[in-house]
């Protein structure tokens, strides 16, 4: 039997998870795996952040203007010639990553709890 790993509530609280809106999406040609470069707006207080996301089962048109949920306090990560600043969250399925649904009432920058 595999030993389960348990997170603590404090470790969950250490994550800054926010609602954002994808302002721009483009194919990330230099990434090793198929990916998009995303420019995401997290409200006036946080502003814009970049993400490299392996969510290629969506078109650019489906991504731009879409609300997403992202962890915004991981350290920036260099992906090829691009700095990814946030991790966009989704469900891992047989068809690829399915972005989490966000209510239209949620505004950019709202915290996720």
Q: Where are the model-predicted features located?
A:
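Phosphate-backbone binding interfaces of nucleic-acid-interacting proteins
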Residues: 1-113
């Amino acid at each position: 039997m595999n030993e389960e790993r348990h997170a603590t509530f404090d470790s969950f609280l250490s994550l800054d998870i926010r609602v954002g809106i994808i302002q721009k999406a483009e194919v990330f040609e230099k990434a090793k795996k198929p990916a998009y470069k995303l420019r995401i707006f997290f409200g006036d207080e946080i502003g814009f952040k970049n993400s490299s996301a392996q969510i290629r089962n969506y078109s650019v048109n489906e991504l731009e203007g879409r609300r997403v949920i992202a962890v915004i306090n991981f350290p920036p990560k260099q992906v090829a010639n691009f700095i990814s600043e946030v991790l966009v969250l989704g469900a891992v399925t047989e068809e690829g990553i399915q972005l989490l649904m966000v209510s239209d009432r949620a505004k950019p920058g709202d915290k996720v709890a």
